């Protein structure tokens, strides 16, 4: 068997998430169906580096799969790209070692979260930016977001029901910028891994801080007490993008 690593992007609006699930459309299943057709009906299993939720987008998701033959990478990329649904793009494909696993190989991820604070909102971006039409103090949020950098126990920002026991993660970059129109905010988070709904919970908390409904020091309190009830609401999924996954050499 020959193992391939692919970088893909997708519009998450019409998907129930990346991971295959019964009675719902998923990115994994759509790519597997296309690869199975290319493999003359023989089933191909796709593995993903990240499991994005329903409505979450990806600019640089990474997958891997095995084929029983070797094929030119660009020809394979073109075939998979053109025969996959319109809301999935295959950016690149490369041959990798047989023991490479996109999820378990050491890597870091970068996510972006886009907020539309326009009044009214931009209707063309309604599936691609989370609307928050309330006053926001950007400087307060920029101070607060820096408190998330470093190695912390992020239990207070994790959704209930997660089976992960070790909730210590390292965030190497946490930043917030505003576009030139002042309407769109982009939150960026890079790190060695993120917990279930962690980014959406962090953004929901930062928006509350920006709206003066929580103090800037609330971030310190949440990290110290490890209490989800102290954090803000979970931000909607439509503003979240898996931007990039970087593997160590």
Curated annotation (Swiss-Prot):
Among InterPro entries, the record links this protein to:
PsdUridine_synth_cat_dom_sf, PsdUridine_synth_TruA, PsdUridine_synth_TruA_a/b_dom, PsdUridine_synth_TruA_C, TruA/RsuA/RluB/E/F_N
The Gene Ontology biological process annotation of the record reads: tRNA pseudouridine synthesis
Query: Keyword Cell inner membrane: yes or no?
Result: no
* Keywords linked to the UniProt accession: Isomerase, tRNA processing
Catalytic reaction(s) noted: uridine(38/39/40) in tRNA = pseudouridine(38/39/40) in tRNA
Per UniProt, the enzyme's principal EC class comes to: isomerase
Belongs to which family? Belongs to the tRNA pseudouridine synthase TruA family.
Record's function text: Formation of pseudouridine at positions 38, 39 and 40 in the anticodon stem and loop of transfer RNAs.
Q: How does it assemble?
A: Homodimer.
Designated name of the protein: tRNA pseudouridine synthase A
Q: Where does this protein come from, organism-wise?
A: Streptococcus pneumoniae (strain Taiwan19F-14)
Lineage of source species: Bacteria, Bacillati, Bacillota, Bacilli, Lactobacillales
Gene that this sequence comes from: truA
């Amino acid at each position: 068997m020959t193992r391939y690593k692919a970088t893909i992007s997708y519009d998450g609006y019409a998907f129930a998430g990346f991971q295959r699930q019964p009675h719902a459309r998923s990115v994994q299943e759509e790519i597997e169906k296309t690869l199975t057709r290319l493999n003359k009906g023989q089933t191909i299993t796709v593995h993903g580096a990240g499991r994005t939720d329903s409505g979450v987008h990806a600019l640089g998701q990474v997958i891997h799969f095995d084929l029983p033959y070797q094929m030119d990478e660009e020809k394979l990329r073109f075939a998979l790209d053109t025969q996959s649904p319109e809301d999935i793009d295959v950016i690149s494909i490369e041959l990798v070692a047989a023991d490479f696993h996109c999820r378990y190989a050491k890597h870091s991820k970068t996510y972006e979260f886009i907020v539309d604070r326009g009044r009214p909102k931009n209707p063309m971006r309604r599936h691609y930016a989370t609307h928050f039409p309330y006053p926001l103090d950007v400087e307060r949020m920029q101070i607060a977001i820096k408190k998330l950098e470093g190695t912390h126990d992020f239990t207070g920002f994790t959704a209930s029901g997660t089976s992960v026991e070790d909730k210590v993660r390292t965030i190497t970059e946490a930043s917030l910028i505003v576009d030139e129109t002042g309407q769109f905010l982009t939150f960026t988070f890079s790190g060695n891994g993120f917990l279930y709904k962690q980014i959406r919970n962090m953004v929901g908390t930062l928006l509350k801080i920006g709206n003066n409904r929580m103090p800037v020091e609330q971030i310190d309190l949440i990290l110290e007490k490890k209490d989800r009830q102290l954090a803000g609401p979970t931000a909607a999924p439509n503003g979240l993008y898996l931007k990039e996954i970087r593997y160590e050499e």
